[in-house]
Amino acid sequence: MIPGEYILSSESLTGNVGREAKTIEIINTGDRPVQIGSHFHFAEVNPSISFDRSEGYGFRLDIPSGTAVRLEPGDARTVNLVAIGGDRIVAGFRDLVDGPLEDLKVNVWEGREDGWRRSSAAGDAPQELPQVEAAERGRKLDDATDVDTNVGTEEGFEEGRN
């Protein structure tokens, strides 16, 4: 073997075999292009992407690793999603889950005041967002914007968030 050489299997590989999958319709309602990476928790994608967020909870795009889907403003598209595997722990992204997917049983994206969009075939109105998860993580949030107000402050520095 030569250093850096790839030895490939002669057999074809098929990804995501046996995982739950679904197809949903999305639209970019914003005024800028949006790219969604292959392993991004789909329920937490850019707020200008309109779809029923509960359909994306616990799922990611079913595309090759390291690739992305790009939507120009006004673009509508059908995308294939696949269930997130492994330990099913979601950390980071838009920080709406920040833990095991199974711990959160409510749809936290409905009714958000900070630009989250939701569409439904039934046309039902979004429900009020429960304000528990931020407090449980010990963060001080501005009620109007749901922004961590400790970032950039002396208190935030002591807590390691600056």
Curated annotation (Swiss-Prot):
Catalytic reaction(s) noted: urea + 2 H2O + H(+) = hydrogencarbonate + 2 NH4(+)
Primary enzyme class: hydrolase
Region (Disordered): 116-162
Top-rank taxon, per record: Bacteria
Composition-biased stretches (Basic and acidic residues): 134-143
Cellular location(s): Cytoplasm
Expression induction or repression: By urea and nitrogen starvation.
Protein name (database record): Urease subunit beta
Species, as recorded: Corynebacterium glutamicum (strain ATCC 13032 / DSM 20300 / JCM 1318 / BCRC 11384 / CCUG 27702 / LMG 3730 / NBRC 12168 / NCIMB 10025 / NRRL B-2784 / 534)
Recorded name of the encoding gene: ureB
